[in-house]
């Protein structure tokens, strides 16, 4: 019988450390609900002591989820541990993740602590956390660059203090599979406990080895894997959890371990996080990329048509990729639309459904067929506008002279106040963005501008992603519309609105 591998998702904590990614409160709740639906065992919902915004979102997630454990991150600082307790105490399964750096470079350059001081801190704070939590996870940060004898001491100290989960972070993606696996083997042989201890792997992808290292950890006794959807995270990212889940499923003959992941929800979960993060999934990304089940070669196409197993080790349907769908059209009624929402996993109240149906009809008048991706985009766009503190009211453009364009932008805030300004630029989008900058009275730097087509065809909706820098803060925005210029304006206004919201959030503990 296969053993169970726990999946610990840190998309909302480590994943949000991706430059430019800043999930809103509502986005974090939606992601948490979808992760529970996907079947993860534990969600690391945030770092509650870092800000009041993080505390509130962790608290809301803890109150919302019913089956998934909700975990908060804490340094070896009592105020951090208190913040995790207060924010997660309403959870069905509250958890805490306590960490301290243990490698020589971190001890000497960051912590300014001796080995003895680090060990004393581990004992004090794991013991303190154990007073509030049945399950305490401890991580020796930068474990793979920590002297192995000292790493064993740190883990033994944490276990003696009550830790029942030991996580081994490859914090800078430094290790390789054989070495990383040996660390797990050595720790299990060397550390003694009077209670059950689960060993966990947390890998970064700086050398492109995060998933390989995680699988090596499983081969050497790890029973929990930490990571993110789509592998997002700071620098080169984290272990892509969907790759681990499918790797264990497809190669059960080798690993003899399984997760409780609902594989059919994989693509929808990946797409949701990609949209909210504003990070497009690469076409050639394993499992969830657009090319994952595409075959261009004539030989490959011939083989797949005769027998899909010739070139496919898993089916698209396994991960929720639909090869056929019944699109809606302008003649589709309220009942068909409601059934489509349910089929796509949306739980929408009757009043909101009426609003969405009107917007669906507007889209249907412009498109021959409204696909599932159109519906996802419609709902995302509606949610963005409903929750926005500023939204675009009108946009007017006209040609001036000598290649210059002029734009007039009118936006409305959440209280109903309107703001208007105009500007010129060397192109339509430049003039629009200059006008928006004038409204907000901010100097910005446009870092990234990207147009995605929601679906194929000339009648497709445009999804515009922007990343801008304001006062050394990077923020992102998404805008969806049939008109590319209006979608561009919406995305830019949303990015500005995020900056305004972020600057209003009270900063938390920093020490």
Swiss-Prot record:
Ranges for region Regulatory domain: 391-511
Residue intervals of the Pyruvate carboxyltransferase domain: 5-267
Main location: cytoplasm
Catalytic activity: 3-methyl-2-oxobutanoate + acetyl-CoA + H2O = (2S)-2-isopropylmalate + CoA + H(+)
Keywords: Amino-acid biosynthesis, Branched-chain amino acid biosynthesis, Cytoplasm, Leucine biosynthesis, Manganese, Metal-binding, Transferase
Residues involved in Mn(2+) binding: 14, 202, 204, 238
Subunit structure, interactors included: Homodimer.
Name under which the protein is recorded: 2-isopropylmalate synthase
Source organism per UniProt: Staphylococcus saprophyticus subsp. saprophyticus (strain ATCC 15305 / DSM 20229 / NCIMB 8711 / NCTC 7292 / S-41)
Lineage: Bacteria, Bacillati, Bacillota, Bacilli, Bacillales
């Amino acid at each position: 019988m296969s053993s169970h591998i726990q999946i610990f998702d840190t998309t909302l904590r480590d994943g949000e450390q991706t430059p430019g990614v800043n999930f809103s409160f509502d986005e974090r709740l939606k992601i948490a609900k979808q992760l529970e639906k996907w079947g993860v065992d534990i969600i690391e919902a945030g770092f509650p002591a870092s800000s009041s915004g993080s505390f509130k979102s962790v608290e809301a997630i803890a109150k919302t989820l019913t089956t998934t454990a909700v975990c908060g991150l804490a340094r070896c600082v009592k105020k951090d541990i208190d913040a995790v307790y207060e924010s997660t105490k309403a959870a069905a399964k509250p958890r805490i993740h306590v960490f301290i750096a243990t490698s020589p470079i971190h001890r000497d350059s960051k912590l300014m602590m001796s080995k003895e001081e680090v060990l004393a801190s581990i004992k004090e704070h794991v013991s303190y956390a154990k007073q509030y939590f049945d399950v305490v996870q401890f991580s020796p940060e930068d474990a793979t660059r920590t002297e192995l004898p000292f790493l064993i001491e740190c883990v033994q100290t944490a276990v003696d203090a009550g830790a029942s989960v030991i996580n081994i972070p490859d914090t800078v993606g430094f290790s390789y599979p054989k070495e990383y696996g040996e660390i797990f083997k050595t720790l299990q042989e060397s550390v003694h406990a009077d209670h059950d201890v689960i060993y966990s792997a947390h890998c970064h992808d700086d050398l492109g080895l995060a998933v390989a290292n995680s699988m090596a950890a499983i081969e050497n006794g790890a029973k929990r894997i930490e990571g993110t959807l789509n592998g997002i995270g700071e620098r080169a990212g984290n272990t892509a959890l969907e790759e681990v889940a499918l790797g264990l499923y497809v190669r059960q003959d080798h690993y003899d371990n399984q997760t409780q992941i609902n594989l059919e929800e994989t693509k929808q979960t990946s797409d949701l996080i990609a949209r909210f993060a504003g990070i497009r999934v690469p076409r050639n990304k394993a499992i969830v990329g657009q090319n994952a089940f595409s075959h261009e070669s004539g030989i490959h196409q011939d083989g797949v048509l005769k027998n899909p197993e010739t070139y496919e080790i898993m089916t698209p349907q396994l991960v929720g990729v639909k090869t056929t769908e019944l699109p809606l059209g302008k003649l589709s009624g309220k009942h068909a639309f409601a059934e489509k929402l349910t089929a796509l996993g949306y739980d929408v109240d009757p009043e909101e459904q009426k609003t969405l149906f009107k917007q669906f009809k507007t889209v249907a008048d412009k498109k021959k067929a409204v696909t599932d991706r159109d519906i996802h985009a419609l709902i995302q766009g509606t949610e963005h506008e409903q929750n926005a503190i500023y939204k675009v009211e009108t946009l007017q453009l006209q040609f001036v002279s000598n290649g210059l364009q002029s734009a007039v932008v009118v936006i409305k805030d959440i209280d109903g106040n309107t703001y208007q300004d105009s500007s010129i630029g060397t192109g339509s989008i430049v003039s629009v963005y200059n006008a928006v900058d004038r409204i907000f009275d901010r100097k910005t730097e446009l870092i990234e501008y990207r147009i995605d087509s929601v679906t194929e065809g000339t009648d497709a909706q445009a999804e515009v992603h922007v990343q801008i820098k304001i006062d050394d803060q990077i923020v992102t925005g998404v805008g969806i519309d049939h008109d590319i210029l209006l979608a561009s304006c919406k995305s830019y206004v949303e990015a500005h609105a995020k900056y305004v919201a972020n600057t209003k959030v009270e900063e938390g503990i920093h020490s």
